[in-house]
């Protein structure tokens, strides 16, 4: 049975669910999840959790993400990226200095109105389904945090590359759209590559075709406790081990805080929280 994490470099034109479905078939494991959707046009870091490791998705999904994005000024589309239909073209008077000046307003805590072409739901229907039917509904602004935002380079007339580090739930194409609006010329996203997610970088990512061609695909999985490497480790046995496996708090001499908890044979049991000499389970990962 396959259990663990594989960081995929998602290819263009694949949906995140396409990638998960392919991995599900290759590894013969129905429990497969990912830590953050990438649009089909996007490429880059996509951590995929397999088997018992899917229990870690909720932690990974909350993490910051980093992107390299293409920004095209002077063009507005219905999807806020270059895959959509052009709805407006405007002259661009802004130069790189103007762009860099405009970015200041988008750093820190901001609000975004989610795009109609998104998987968010309204009355049980996904927004993109309504958009394709020619309907537009009101969307409430949502708070997001832009931790870093900078111009990397100018790649052509009115075209730039941006580096974006942001919180969960940020729409980079909406960011591009809003930056263009702030400059008075409109804009859209022309490319997107995720360079970091859930603490994993492009250097750790495996091309999807490498997984599909591997003689032993399961060998490419890293253990789920690798995701929690920042936490200290403690080993339990005897009565404490039995209580841990029953989901009960157990005595522990560890300092207060969160810990990786292992059995005497090195099996990763759970992520726990120690307080006042007692360890309680945050999330268990052992085989039942």
Region spans (language model):
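Accessory RNA 3′-end/elbow-binding domains used by RNA modification enzymes
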Residues: 1-9, 13, 17-34, 38, ...
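Catalytic cores of RNA-modifying enzymes
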Residues: 1-167, 174, 178-204
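A short, terminal or domain-edge coil/loop segment
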Residues: 88-91, 126, 169-173, 242-256
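A short local loop/turn or secondary-structure capping micro-motif enriched for an aromatic residue
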Residues: 137, 169, 277-280
